[in-house]
Structure formats: C-alpha cells, structure tokens
Amino acid sequence: NEEKAYKKLDLNPDDFRIDILAPIKRGWKSSGVGFFIGKQGNLLTASPSIMGSNKIRVRFSNGRTEPVKLVQKFIVYKIAILKLENPNKELPKPLVFEDTPHFKEDNTVYAMDFLKLQTPNPSLSKGKILKENALENSDKIVQLDLAVQKGQSGGPLFNNDGNVIGLILEKSLAQKSFSYLKDAPANASFAIKS
C-alpha cells in the first residue's frame, strides 16, 4: 500500500524523481543518489558516488541535467555536499529535516527505492531501527533493519512524519569506514543521523 504510505508521510513520488546523479552523454556514468536540502541548490549524497569525478551532473525526473560542484566532503562519514552551479533555475522542492529527530530501537523508518525511479510511483521501503547508536564511540550512526541495495547510499531516511532524519549508507560502505560494524547482521543497513 504505497499510496497509503505516501499519504501518511505527506510525500509525493515526484519529490524523489529529481535527485539521481546520472550520466548525460557517452562517457558519463550513473553513480548514486542524493537529495536537495534548503533553497540554495545544495544536495546531500554519499561521497563515494562522486569519487574520482572531474565533472558532476544531476539529472532531474524531467530529463533535465545540471552541473554541480563539490562544496564539502566529510570523509569519515562518507557524506558530500554538492551545489548546483546555476541555482537560479527552478529548483525542486527540498526535503524537510526533522527538527529534533528521535532514534529509538524498533521505531519505523522509510527509504525511497531509488533503483525504481524510472517507474511512475517509486516504492518506499519500510524498516525499523535496530540500534540507536551502532558505534561505541559515536552517536552519529544508526543501525537499521531496512532493505538498502548497492547504489542507494546517499538517499534520505524518513520518519513517520515524512521528515528526513538521516542519510542512508548501504552496509558494505558503512563497514569500510567503521570496523565496529563488521559484525552487523546480514540484513542490516546504516544511516548517518541528521
């Protein structure tokens, strides 16, 4: 019942069809997902999706592509902030961050299935929080029971209100940065808390 989930979270499938980092011509390669934050044309993504790139473009759901530049990269947490080179053009609606996100074990969370963005209604994946603090020495990483496929790192993690509470990292990517996560269950994924 994706329609019910979209309605409950006050979301629209088109809110997600805009944020694919994708090729625009031969030689370009699609490498990840991201989402707009704020009204200045900034995007969040997982930094490995732009690793080794000299030029980066985003492709919107209507096929339009725009160049972006790297603003900041947070190496430890695998986060990159990108900015549209021409933010004066019409921008998609940015996602709303939860002011005071709560992370409690067994709380329900949602993620967009970015692998199915070519369909008119991309699906939402529903999961739950397994560990509020997945690392002993940091309160920034949450462990999830949520299906996250390769290439979906950099997408938003939503709460029941449809607000962003984190940035999703697939298991293998999170484990490369944090050795404590090596023993995570097979179905686990992770998120950087917002």
PLM segments and residue spans:
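Residue-level recognition of beta-strand microenvironments
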Residues: I37-K39, V71-K73, E132-N133, N160, ...
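A structural micro-motif recognizing beta-strand termini
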Residues: I24, K39, S61, L82-E90, ...
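Catalytic-histidine neighborhood of serine endopeptidases
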Residues: S31, G38-K89, K104
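Flexible, gly/ser-rich surface segments that form the specificity/activation loops bordering the active-site cleft
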Residues: E90-I141, V148-S153, I168-L181
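A conserved glycine-rich beta-strand in the N-terminal activation segment of trypsin-fold
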Residues: I18-Q40, A46, R64-P67, G154, ...
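A short, polar/charged loop-to-alpha-helix boundary motif
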Residues: K55-V58, A174-I192
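Protease-domain processing segments flanking chymotrypsin-fold serine proteases, especially trypsin-like
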Residues: N1-K29
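Terminal peptide-recognition signature
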Residues: G34, G41, T45, V68, ...
